[in-house]
């Protein structure tokens, strides 16, 4: 299997070479600034206790607080999270927004959990990574198998520990909790804009074109509809 972290570092090396990047800066930007691995217990509905493993990685904070989602999937790995955090640094820099790159995840198949178990896992995981997150430090949004409901649990957990409501600790919240309208379609709409601009550069007509979409989740399904 392809190691995503090895791929990300290869991409970085190619870009750094082309940019003639200072050797010291290469060493700094080639590795994540922080990697946190947590193992935490969750009480299941049948009374048993399972221990789950989760990660939060901050690749670079030079431009501002880390930005990058938290995913729930049985194939989550530290190398995957590190690569995604590095790519988030690049994405935020390319579009010129004042954020760094981060990413997180838990090794779990959420489809096998009840709503009560999912809430318990979400609240405990966010408690474990709380030392890294915050409105001025690291602001997670949803990702694979996480949504506005999970973000509301994250926000509520952080707010309880802070002693006051902190809506800015996550994005992708429900509208009723200060979320943004259009957030659900944002990733797919960004894809639409990128496709449109790429077609303009390549001088290819968008109307009548055939498009292949990989994946049919929140991004792929909505992108297919918009395209």
Task: Explain the meaning of each model-derived region.
Residues 215-217:
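Glycine-rich Rossmann-fold phosphate-binding loop(s) that bind the pyrophosphate
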């Amino acid at each position: 299997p392809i190691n995503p972290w090895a791929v990300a570092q290869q991409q970085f090396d190619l870009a750094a070479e082309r940019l003639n990047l200072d050797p010291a800066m290469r060493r700094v930007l080639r590795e994540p600034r922080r990697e946190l691995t947590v193992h935490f217990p969750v009480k299941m509905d049948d009374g048993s206790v399972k221990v789950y493993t989760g990660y939060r990685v901050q690749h670079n904070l030079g431009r501002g607080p880390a930005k990058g989602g938290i995913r729930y999937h049985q194939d989550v790995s530290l190398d995957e999270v590190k690569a995604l955090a590095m790519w988030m640094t690049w994405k935020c820099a390319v579009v010129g927004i004042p954020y760094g790159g981060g990413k997180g995840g838990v090794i779990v198949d959420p489809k096998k959990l009840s709503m009560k178990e999912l809430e318990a896992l979400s609240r405990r995981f966010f408690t474990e990574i709380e030392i890294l997150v915050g409105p001025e430090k690291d602001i997670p949004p949803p990702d694979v198998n996480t949504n506005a409901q999970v973000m509301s649990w994250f926000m509520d957990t952080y707010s309880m520990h802070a002693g006051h409501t902190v809506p800015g600790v996550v994005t992708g919240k429900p509208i009723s909790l200060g979320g943004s309208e259009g957030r659900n379609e944002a990733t797919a709409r960004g894809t639409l804009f990128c496709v449109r601009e790429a077609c303009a550069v390549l001088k290819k007509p968008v109307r009548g074109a055939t498009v292949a979409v990989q994946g049919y989740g929140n991004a792929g399904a909505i992108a297919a509809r918009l395209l």
